[in-house]
């Protein structure tokens, strides 16, 4: 039993909780520094030649579960430990402190008040007029007063004792919501070209929402850099005949029945070409990381046997489309909806470039719990700033004086400066 009490005391120690917060913050930083949720091979290949921090390679990242920090067993264990520490701290310290603060302490002797942090003695008539005046004045100032013959006890700001418990409760709810969202939520990143649809399935495998991208636009600055992306979406629920229209843009997500759709990225999906008098050909584009961060293109043969291919590359939907041969020599530069250019004897015209919208779809069931926990934490933090003040007064008819003492859990100096004004309100002449 003694060992269990020591263990509980160690777990609920404030220094342990602060240490856990530091470790959790450091772990969260790791999750920010290392890409999360990518394929296993991407870590093995990406960190084989250039280990993170010089020594953390892909195998170590996978073993330590750094590829999914926020759902790793050790990170969840840290959150559980911190939550247990907060619960034990509230149970062992904050709750007894609140119960003690709710109980009235009846000081009956002047010598008891002299041992308090703040103590004053003022002259007083032989009767209890000063105590009556003090009780009435404290009532007017919002104090709770318990008066007995020849003495009184008063307190104010007792609600501040609830603050730390609410902070602990809010943090626990916030962590529960975060864990619930990590384990029970869904996340999908998808590139959609205009006119393409995405069927979202429920747990039973049935479609519960059809999402169609009707239009996608990229707003650019005068230098050609993208500033804003806008996606026009149609959302159709099963059994409904009419789709609902919504727009999603950067920093303006769509929230729909627990699903949040973010405008996360953009890409180039396809290019429409006309070779000579051929029909319009819509060909898919792919990225070329070896040519740059945002370079798309395709390899186009110029002969029926596939020989003498040329590379068409571009960096935006507005072009230009650069044409290179196998030696890297630029053969032509084309613009969407622009004139035809002859490449190796073949007239080539770029009709249009089709951009794709990068959408991030998230379903996080823990978000309401996170918001509630955050709100409770804010309220608890505000209440914790309220000082709990306690005041006692004991009359001394024989010496015609009144002994006053007080306690305060924060800003004791402010309470000490306020006390003389409280006493001056009941008698114009006071002695210290």
Swiss-Prot record:
A cellular component term from Gene Ontology for this protein is: plasma membrane-derived thylakoid membrane
Q: Does the keyword Plastid apply?
A: no
What UniProt keywords are attached to this protein's entry?
Answer: Cytochrome c-type biogenesis, Membrane, Thylakoid, Transmembrane, Transmembrane helix
- Pfam families to which the protein is assigned, alphabetical: ResB (PF05140)
Q: What GO terms in the biological process aspect are recorded for it? A: cytochrome complex assembly
Membrane topology of this protein: Multi-pass membrane protein
Q: Where in the cell is it found?
A: Cellular thylakoid membrane
Residues crossing the lipid bilayer are 14-34, 72-92, 162-182
- Please classify the protein's predominant subcellular localization into one broad category: membrane
Q: How does it assemble?
A: May interact with CcsA.
Q: Which family does it belong to?
A: Belongs to the Ccs1/CcsB family.
Q: So what does this one do?
A: Required during biogenesis of c-type cytochromes (cytochrome c6 and cytochrome f) at the step of heme attachment.
Annotated HAMAP family: CytC_Ccs1
Protein name (record):
Cytochrome c biogenesis protein CcsB
**Organism whose genome encodes this protein:** Prochlorococcus marinus (strain MIT 9303)
Traced from the root, the source organism's taxonomic lineage reads: Bacteria, Bacillati, Cyanobacteriota, Cyanophyceae, Synechococcales
